[in-house]
Amino acid sequence: KYFQLEKNKHLLLAGLFSGLAMLSKYSGAFIWVGVGLYVVLYSRKEFKNPCMYLSVIISAVCLLPVLIWNINNEFISFTFHGNRVGFFGEFHPEYFLAELVGEFGYNNPVNYVLTIIALVALMKGAKFIDVLPKRLILLLSVPMILLFWFFSLTRQILPHWTAPSFVLLLVFVAAQLADKYSIRDNSFIIPKSIIASFSVLCFTLILGATEIKTGFIPLNFSERSKTVQRYGEGDFTLDMYGWRMIKPEFEKIRSKSITDGVMKETDDMVALKWYPLANLDYYVAYPLGIDMYGFRDPSEIHKYAWINKERGDLQLGEDYWFLTESFDYYEPDKYLKPYFKKII
């Protein structure tokens, strides 16, 4: 009889998709945090529903690949992410302020303000959304925001970590606008706030694409960033520019070195950090038919700790190419000299 109820079918599907969300990103666990709080606070009768427990089991089964992989790899994924956050540490109000400013920009400033307006209206008793979905949405979103805000008091975190919660809170914005601008006489009104939000999005995309392609906005803020070795340092837009330009120039240097007998055609490449390691692998090493290896601890090279082994790992006595960018420069002598007889 339980499976004949439409509600329970949806509950089981929710368990499946929640499990897939957690399989994609650990923060998907906040879905079950929100649901658990909702059941405890407002719907305890669900504790008598077998489908609730079955839904939890379905989510847990989805996580089995993650659990098995971590068991086989000393739980390195859990420890890595655990080190990125923490409950204790020295108080840094500037980190918290940076988080708020980052959220404001990442989530579209107009949307951020509209979200605050909608939340304030709800706190004052506005009735533009039914009470049950209001409670569930708040419990699904607010815990994540509060937890990451707490982390940001003691360490630097990334503003997009709270983005899933802010996306969910946009339901309140939509409900408030729908209540304010109800359709009358088949007339269709686009609220000015929606036009403003869309305009900010379009402006940001156009400005960003133009800056990435042309660099017309000078983002070299220090004298060091104007030198040859450090040119562009601090310009985050360079992360998405110029990767396809590297291979042709490197190919000329590589061909000459092979012709002169300095390097061999089979010599592979190394890099020191997961970024730009993967970029150089995709745009340079792979097209040239050579392997790219990470050359540091797993915390620095991430997945390449395993990719290295799949490719045969670094070999003693072999020569390797090393590429580094001026905007993210790594001094070869500082990082590589202890491991190589000669750097040229």
Segments and roles (model prediction):
Residues 1-10:
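Membrane-interface transmembrane helices that cradle and orient dolichyl/undecaprenyl
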